[in-house]
Regions:
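N-terminal Sec-pathway targeting helices
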Residues: 2-18
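Boundary regions of SH3-family modules and the immediately adjacent low-complexity/disordered segments
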Residues: 27-40, 57, 61, 73, ...
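Short, basic/aromatic beta-hairpin or loop at an interaction surface
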Residues: 41-51, 115-125
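Generic beta-strand structural signal
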Residues: 45, 77-79, 119-120, 149-150
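SH3/SH3-like (including bacterial SH3b) beta-barrel domains
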Residues: 54-71, 76-77, 129-144, 148-150
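Short aromatic-glycine-enriched beta-strand elements
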Residues: 80-85, 152-156
Length: 178
């Protein structure tokens, strides 16, 4: 359980460091008289559809939708690092804000028919809202899950994401017992 808390702290520290790095790069560029626009490619990593919003708040107007695996261009982060501004979208506005936790720096491998995997751990394992996101539920050792996509060390399962190292893939043709 302490390891999960440490992971949450590390993910928050990383988000702050990303924002700090962006600010530092802008300051350095400004002092040299040249400010290059910031751009970063990220990939949508979510179970289903991701809302694109008008501003970096959960209650903000929805202006479009993205799907798992979509490539986005990030050009700004919210002050708290929880949201990213994306451009070049196939939506009416062509831009908007999405939650950072539903993005990945690595390409997302979409799986045609999600393979089954069993949770292998000494205790329960956190299923998170996104990569290194907040815990949304626990799952127990022996639970069989369908893996929808993979990105780096993370596996997307129905209802969230979890570290792939806790999963052992079942042989093709296997299915969960009732």
């Amino acid at each position: 359980m302490q390891a999960m808390r440490k992971l949450e702290i590390v993910s928050k520290v990383l988000a702050v460091l990303v924002v700090a790095e962006m600010a530092l790069m802008l300051l350095i560029g400004a002092s040299l008289g040249e400010v290059e626009p910031f751009q970063e490619t990220r990939y949508v990593f979510c179970d289903g559809v991701l809302n694109v919003r008008m501003s970096p708040r959960g209650g903000s107007e929805i202006t479009g939708y993205l799907f798992c695996g979509d490539e986005v261009t990030v050009d700004d982060y919210s002050k708290d690092g929880a949201w990213v501004h994306v451009t070049g979208l196939p939506t009416e506005y062509g831009e908007g804000w999405i939650a950072y936790r539903y993005t990945s720096a690595e390409e997302v491998e979409l799986l045609e028919e999600g393979p089954l995997a069993v949770v292998e751990a000494n205790g329960r394992v956190a299923v998170r809202a996104g990569i290194a996101g907040e815990r949304v539920r626990w799952t127990s050792p022996g639970t069989v899950l369908t893996v929808l996509a993979r990105s780096g060390e993370w596996a997307l399962v129905r209802g969230g994401a979890m570290m792939e190292s806790y999963l052992s893939y079942l042989e093709e043709g296997s299915h969960a017992e009732a």
